[in-house]
């Protein structure tokens, strides 16, 4: 019953994401942990705004094996990595929004630091705009196992919280439930839009001051 409730919540989140335009042209992928050994991952090439329960494939978390023989998302290995790293993660959302994609390219360092925004409190455990939220940025790579190794290497020394960006690609975020993952996604997207607008205004102000 719990699995059905969570899958229903994930389907609703996917349809909402589709309406937001955060996964255009069948991009993005979503997943749900079932237990310590298995998860459900979206099938490759499916429009996220019109997914059904049949579009989620059973995947073995340890080795990415799909018993059905169907093809899951090409980035399944990043989902299963997160489930192996953090037992508390129960849902992962990967989106391709304009704000996340552009901001990940504008920011030249390997992390995006968000500071001074009240909406930082949309992220679990954040209590004040005076704190900083650090979102790692990884260079994009079509070799997903190699990208997963880089994510795992960072996580060994700096535990990942809320999400990470893949440069020029998009956002991965998660939560201990579908509802928390969805809240983190909405909060981060708002923060990304604020940060992008702030940088644009700063650039225009500096240009006008010359």
UniProtKB/Swiss-Prot annotation:
Cofactor: Zn(2+)
InterPro entries: Aldolase_II/adducin_N, Aldolase_II/adducin_N_sf, MethylthioRu-1-P_deHdtase_MtnB
A GO cellular component annotation in the UniProt record: cytoplasm
Record field: catalytic activity: 5-(methylsulfanyl)-D-ribulose 1-phosphate = 5-methylsulfanyl-2,3-dioxopentyl phosphate + H2O
GO term, biological process aspect, one: L-methionine salvage from methylthioadenosine
Binding site for Zn(2+): 94, 96
Cofactor descriptive note: Binds 1 zinc ion per subunit.
Protein name: Methylthioribulose-1-phosphate dehydratase
Organism for this UniProt entry: Yersinia enterocolitica serotype O:8 / biotype 1B (strain NCTC 13174 / 8081)
Encoding gene per record: mtnB
């Amino acid at each position: 019953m719990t699995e059905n409730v969570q899958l229903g919540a994930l389907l609703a989140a996917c349809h909402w994401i589709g309406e937001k335009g955060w996964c255009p042209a069948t991009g993005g992928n979503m997943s749900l942990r079932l237990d310590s050994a298995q998860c459900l991952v979206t099938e490759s090439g499916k429009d996220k705004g019109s997914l059904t329960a049949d579009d989620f494939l059973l995947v073995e978390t340890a080795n990415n094996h799909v018993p059905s023989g169907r093809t899951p998302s090409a980035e399944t290995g990043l989902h299963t990595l997160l489930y192996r790293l953090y037992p508390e993660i129960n849902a992962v959302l990967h989106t391709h929004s304009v704000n996340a994609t552009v901001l990940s390219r504008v920011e030249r360092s390997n992390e995006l630091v968000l500071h001074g925004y009240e909406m930082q409190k949309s992220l679990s455990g954040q209590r004040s705009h005076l704190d900083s939220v650090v979102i790692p940025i990884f260079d994009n790579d079509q070799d997903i196992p190699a990208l997963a190794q880089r994510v795992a290497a960072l996580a060994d020394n700096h535990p990942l919280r809320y999400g990470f960006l893949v440069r020029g690609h998009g956002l991965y975020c998660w939560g201990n439930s579908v509802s928390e993952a969805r809240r983190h996604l909405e909060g981060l997207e708002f923060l990304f839009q604020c940060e992008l607008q702030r940088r644009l205004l700063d650039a225009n102000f500096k240009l006008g001051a010359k």
